[in-house]
C-alpha cells in the first residue's frame, strides 16, 4: 500500500547561513552604518535588535530575501514579538516553526477526508502519514495539501510504493 509522510522541518545550518549573509549585508549597507544592529539565532528563536521601526522592517525584509536565496520557506519564520530593549532600541524575537501542530494536522486530515479520495491520513506526533491504494491518489493528496493555506512549510518524505 503506497504511503508518504507530511512533515514540517527546517534546516538549521541553512538558517545560520542565511542569517550570516543577512548580517554581512547589514554591515555593508550605508543606511545601517553606526546603527549597531544585531541578528542572532538561539535554538528555535531569531533575535533582532536595532534602533527604530524602519530599520527593523528593513532587517526583516533582508532576512526574508536571504531565506529565499537559500531556498528556505519564509513561512518557517513564525510569531514575531516586538518589544522595547534598553535605551532607544527595539528587540524582535521570531520563533522558527518546526513540526505540524495538532490543530493544523486535524485540519489537513479533515480536508483529505472531505475530498472523497480513497486515502487515509493518520497523525503521528508532529507529522502525518498518508496511505492510499493508488499512487495517483497520493499525488493528488500532495497537491491538495500544497494548495491549502495552512501557514507553515510542509515537505513530503518517505514516499513508498
List where the protein language model places each region:
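N-terminal intrinsically disordered, cationic/polar leader segments
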Residues: 1-13, 17-21, 25-108, 114-115, ...
